């Protein structure tokens, strides 16, 4: 059995709408979400994105729910707070010592550069006024964004899978790989090197971005990939397993796609449930070309 045969993998079948796109048509996206279940409450954070001409990723919202489908917005962060052109994938993490941290992906104005920032506060409503700290500044050579962050339940080591875009070749900044980092506090990180990249000639040739952890033993992840530059923003979902030194994509599995418009099925976030199932949140294309945030249980 390949890892693609895992019964917990998501698909578009049976999905429910959680957050609709902020408008109709291409470029309007609700998604790039991450979610966590804490004391019976689902906490969800996502970016609200409009077309390039209307501001791109203007806000990040944080909401709560007791059923995982119907959410009440608790707070919101605006791009102006960070002086950035756009916001992309956020991550909300409950801190082991108490309190919350919101990680944000921020785009530098008039460039292809991205960095990862953060806000830390005692409560979720207090996050917009929380303590700000840059987590990873990126560089002139590399843009960094869309972190996946977890705390290992055994070692208590913080883990990050970070999407990296090389900026050294103009016109090719959409290429992406994933690096693995560790930390003792979630603020200062050690870079463990590249762990996932696209495969020449395959559906993920242009890049591979880890999106969520499906299981830990063995380590199985979902990732976004695409074949070419023209598919930028329309990634689809694949699966990979840790082989002891890096993540290896399932060689037999086709990517999971939306049946609508550009086919995007990306930024999956997996939430383990008490009954052994998994609730997924995914950004998926709809018929008019917009992207909704959907959820499903496997």
For each feature predicted by the language model, list its residue ranges.
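Predominantly extracellular/luminal carbohydrate-interaction, adhesion, and secreted-enzyme modules
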Residues: 209
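A basic- and aromatic-enriched beta-loop-alpha substructure that forms the phosphate/nucleotide-
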Residues: 88
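Beta-rich carbohydrate-recognition and catalytic domains
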Residues: 1-85, 93-206, 214-263, 272-298
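Short glycine-rich, acidic/polar surface loops and turns
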Residues: 266-268
